[in-house]
Amino acid sequence: QGIKRTFPRRKKAMIFAAGLGTRLKPLTDTRPKALVEIAGKPLIEHVLQKLVSAGFNDIVVNVHHFADMIEEWGRNIVETPYYKDKNIRISFSDERHELLETGGGILHAAALLTNNNPEHKFLVHNVDILSNLNLDEFWTKSHGSADAVLVVSKRKTARYLIFDDEMNLVGWTNISTGEIKSPYEEVHEQLSQRPQDALDFRNYHLRAFSGIHLI
C-alpha cells in the first residue's frame, strides 16, 4: 500500500503585481514591474520565496500591466521542483479591464482569498517591497489581534498614515500639500499645529506604510 502525501493547510497571501511601474521606466516599457530583475531574480520571485519560506502556500497575484507575462511566469514557477514539492498554488486576479488600486484589488480578489469566509485571514505584500521582516512571526503575532495590521516605518516621505498613542490608525496626511484625511476632528486640529519635521506630535504619530499588511 502506497504512502499518501499530506500537505499543510492552505495559508493565503496576495502579491500586488498589477502596477504600471512608471518609476522603473524604461525597464517597464517591455515587461511588468513584477518581472524586473534584482540580484538575478524577478521582484516577484523574491517575494514568493519569502512567502513560501514563511509557510504561505496559496498565493493570489493580481495582474494588469503585461498580465500575460506574469501569468506565464506563475504557471512555470509552480512546476519547478522546489515549489512543486511544497504544493504551492498560484492563482490570478484579473484586472486587465481596470487597475483597481489597493482596496479595489483586494475586494476583486476576495473570493480567491477567503473562500467566501470573512473570518479567513490573509497577508498582502507589494511586489516591489524587499525586506528582512520575519513574515511568519508577523503572521503569528498579528493574527486575530485586529481587523487589519499594517507594517509601517519611521522614515521620511510625503504621505503618512496617522496613528494614536495605541497605534490605532486614525487618518492619513500628505505633508507636501498639507492635506489631512481623518474622521476625527481632533486629528485635524492637532496636526494642523504640527512642526514641519515632527513625526511624533502630542498624541499622534506619522508613519510610512511599508507595503505589507494582514487582513
Region roles according to the model:
Residues 29-33:
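Short alpha-helical oligomerization interface
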Residues 130-215:
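Conserved core of the sugar-phosphate nucleotidyltransferase
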Residues 20:
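Conserved SAM/SAH-binding loop
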Residues 2-15, 23, 37, 41-126, ...:
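Conserved N-terminal catalytic core of the sugar/cofactor nucleotidyltransferase
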